[in-house]
Regions:
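Transition segment at domain starts
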Residues: 5-16
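Short, surface-exposed charged micro-motifs
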Residues: 13, 31-33, 72
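Short hydrophobic/aromatic-rich beta-strand segments that constitute the beta-sheet cores
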Residues: 24, 42-44, 82
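Glycine- and acidic-residue-biased ligand/ion/polar-headgroup-sensing regions
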Residues: 32, 36-50, 78
Length: 87
């Protein structure tokens, strides 16, 4: 299960196995796009300046143990986090 948070609030929850794009548009102009494709999730777009979240690459159940942030993709400037969890 993919869970997208804005700040501490759950924004959306989606299956890892249903392809889709989750668009987060905040009142302050921040925008992120989380893409779910073929059992993987990644930050496809962000308005943040540093683009660290986009550069974190894709997350799958098979690669979370080897990722620096484990089962998270984090966009600190926009306060958007993506968690790959069970369910």
């Amino acid at each position: 299960m993919v869970r997208v948070y804005v700040g501490e609030e759950l924004y959306e929850e989606a299956s890892l196995y249903m392809d889709r794009t989750i668009v987060i548009e905040q009142d302050n102009g921040c925008r992120n796009e989380v893409r779910i494709e073929k059992g993987r999730v990644y930050m496809a777009f962000s308005t943040c300046e540093n683009q660290n979240c986009v550069n974190q690459g894709e997350m799958t159940p098979d690669n979370i143990a080897s990722r620096a942030l484990s089962n998270w993709i984090i966009c600190l400037p926009n306060r958007v986090t993506v968690e790959l969890g069970e369910g």
